[in-house]
Each structure stands twice: as C-alpha cells, then as structure tokens.
Amino acid sequence: LRLSEQGYLKRTADEVWIPDERFFERSLSDTSVVAGLPTFISDVAADPFMIDQFLVNKPSKTILIPVQGDSMINVGINDGDIVVVEVSSTANNGDIVVATIDEEFTVKTLGKKKGKPVLLPANDSYPVIQPKGSLKILGVVIGLVRKYGK
C-alpha cells in the first residue's frame, strides 16, 4: 500500500500490481559535468529523473530499435546503440528516420535530390540511397540509448 501511495506500484483493473511511473525513477544530478576542463564540485545533489519522461512524448507511438552497422556514425549513432523512434508515416527533410526502402530496413537522414526523397548516410563509406521502388517512413528518431562497457 505504501509503494502505491508513493507512486511506485499501481493495480490494474484485474487487481494485478504493476510498476507505476516512479518505479523507473533514477537520480539526476542538479550539477552538470564539464566536458572541457575539470571544475570543482563541492556537493552534488540529485533529483528524481525518469528517462521515459525525458525521451518519450508519445509512449503509445514510441518504439526502441537496436542499430546494426556504422552508416550513421558521423551523427553519433553507433553499432549496438538503440534508437528511440516515434512512429510516424511522415517526416521532415533533415530528420533522422527509420524507413523501409525497396523492402530493406534502415536508419538514415531523410533528404531530397532533384525533388525526390533520398536517404543520406552519415559515413562517407556509404552511398546515398535513392529508392528504385517504394520508400516508407516507419518513424523519426527522437533519442538514443547507449551502453558503455559490459
């Protein structure tokens, strides 16, 4: 009962206990880490933080997809990363999208060439993809999850 009152657990309609939003909280420091020269931190406080609330605007339309390959490394998407994708059949020029092109599944930047949509890699070792047949947008990449180490 106490975990329910604090927002960690909730009951479903069929009386099953499941995790509620606060169950997934992590601590977020209110002090940023400097990526340049080190700075002195005298006291680091931490506030509750939920990754889903930070990354996901539309939970029912958001999926996670593992990345294989290195065609997007120049925009920071590496092999083994997980892209957070908001499902949508449309995207804007310049959006990083997950798409199917000629029955192939890929993550690339949506662009235009001679008025027609193309998929742009972020690695000079890969060519621009110009659809010979169909291009279908599955969704737009809105975030990224990466694990370091083991």
Residue ranges and their predicted role:
Residues 2-78, 143-150:
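Short, positionally conserved secondary-structure boundary motifs
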Residues 58-150:
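Acidic/glycine-rich C-terminal interaction modules and beta/coil loop segments
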